[in-house]
Amino acid sequence: MKIGILGAGNIGATAARLFVAAGHDVAVSNSRGPDSLRELISELGPQAHAMTIRDAARFGDAVLLAVPWRTPEALPEPELLRNKIVMDAMNPYRPDGGFYDLGGSTSSEEVLKRLPGSRLVKAFNTIYYV
């Protein structure tokens, strides 16, 4: 399976390692661009590719969202993820350790509002990283 990973921090990079070890091809992206991912991609080997966020979203049969909650601009346009499996590993944490007020909504409901038509699955939200 081809998996696009949006976010290359603790969760995104760890997931990339695990997906590659399981035999999947991955496209890793972050807000700083593909050049900033050279070391990680080198570590992961030929099954891994550094891409822009939009290209990683296009690449994946499934896509992992592993970007900070405060950066919704890191999410691609909804049409790029329409009908794709989207694994939501985001949590509404503020930088100070508190939570963003979602007005009674859940984080997954908020993500689905931003990405209508995707097949959203909440995943990895109770772990920091493996």
Question: What are the residue ranges of the model-derived segments?
Answer:
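NAD(P)+-binding Rossmann beta1-loop-alpha1 motif at the extreme N-terminus of oxidoreductases
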Residues: 1-43
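Short amphipathic alpha-helical segments
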Residues: 16-18, 40-41, 75-79, 98-100
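Rossmann-like NAD(P)-binding element
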Residues: 45-47, 51-96
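Rossmann-fold NAD(P)-binding glycine/threonine-rich loop
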Residues: 89-130
